Design a protein with these regions (language model features):
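Helix-turn-helix DNA-binding motif, specifically the short coil turn and the N-cap/start of the second
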Residues: 59-63
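The alpha-helix within a helix-turn-helix
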Residues: 54
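N-terminal leader segment of winged-helix/HTH proteins
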Residues: 1-29, 74, 95, 138
Length: 141
């Protein structure tokens, strides 16, 4: 199969190119793609447990623990014990973590606009539907 005929390779290459573009933009704020992905989850809902973040991000526990430690050290997030179960650590944004939401939202829009440049509005909608369906197929939904 030719490279251009392999959806998996093309999607992977697109994701990699978009991630590099986003990573380049985030670098000026000392944030990595993985850290930004966690911040996005916390912007949607603060106070998630590390296990919940692990599930949302599709990462293993050790990776999430390392991310949380680094992000705490950078002053992006803080951990607090769950009031009803002291064994559970809840993750909350700091002011610095909150402040990055609007800035990085612009970055995300720019990266997406760059990737979809030349697409009509209908093509964008159709492309996203196809990607969503392919993802659902792979996830068994």
């Amino acid at each position: 199969m030719d490279f251009a005929e392999s959806p998996g390779l093309l999607i992977n290459k697109l994701a990699h190119a978009m991630a590099l573009d986003m990573d380049r933009r985030l670098k000026s704020y000392d944030v990595t793609m993985s850290q930004w992905a966690m911040l996005k989850q916390l912007w949607r809902q603060e106070g998630r447990s590390q296990v919940e973040l692990q599930e949302f991000l599709g990462l293993d526990g050790a990776t999430v623990t390392g991310l949380v430690q680094r992000m705490t050290h950078l002053g992006l997030i803080q951990r607090r014990p769950d009031p009803s179960d002291k064994r559970v650590q809840r993750v909350f944004l700091t002011e610095r973590g909150r402040a990055l939401e609007q800035i990085t939202a612009v970055f995300e829009e720019e990266v997406n606009a760059h990737a979809l440049a030349g697409f009509s509005a209908d093509e964008r909608v159709f492309f996203l539907r196809l990607l969503t369906r392919a993802l659902q197929n792979c996830e068994g939904k």
